[in-house]
């Protein structure tokens, strides 16, 4: 066998061996939240959606429809929106109101509502969420048996009125016994506040709050609410600050799965539709949601880098056509 042939055979064996190792070795998890239907990583929703399809009694599906498209659908559905730092526009608020007046329940998970915003004025709620997971930090604390790793989430559905918090007639969907859940602190960041003036006119139900000592008393909120439900029209709006629990990780973890199922039960009286931005490579709420209804060309022209790339391709094609035409239009010499 020639030396060249040996080298070729050796390279082929090496390449095949490397590919085999890459295929059979376990893949590393990606801990970045996507909430995507097809994502099987911890903070995707492949398993979450699969479990909900089997457990929601009236039906469940994930869809790439925007909130506006969902409102236009005449079907009577409850809506679940799980986002990362989601923002509501005035159009989104109008659409949510229409769903609530229709009798639907809308659950907003990971959607920020700032003080004095139009959403705050509409529903009497402020909400700050947080969706980052520091894997290495948690891994180090677990290795050292750190006490500063967990927090206690307390489920105790109570009615909030203008005079304070008290027991009240609870809707069946939230009337569970009190329960405590010991959960990683980083999964429980965020807080919901109730406008005391709005509580005079509406019924608010506090579903859960953290009860452990706060990591920094200087910044500790008065009420560390994590999930709040408000009655609006014929429907209910549920605001949740913990989007990382509505994922594969949250539904598979024994410490969080019962809590997630309690919250999901608020949607169980009708078919549930989860709006998933990843299914259309865009957004289902916020200013970017209009991109779903735009043509591919309009989206390209709306993005400066894509727009200049498009113009460059067009200009290059024109130059190529011109020079090609000039080269082919040669003068044919006349042979005497």
Question: Which residues make up each language-model segment?
Answer:
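Alpha-helix initiation/capping motif
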Residues: 66, 114, 242, 275-276, ...
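Long alpha-helical segments found as membrane-embedded helices
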Residues: 1-60, 70-78, 83-102, 106, ...
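A glycine-centered loop/beta-turn motif at secondary-structure junctions
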Residues: 182-292
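An acidic, glycine-rich "communication" segment
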Residues: 112-214
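Membrane-embedded segments
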Residues: 60-156
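Flexible, active-site-adjacent loop/turn segments at secondary-structure boundaries
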Residues: 33-35, 123, 243-244, 249
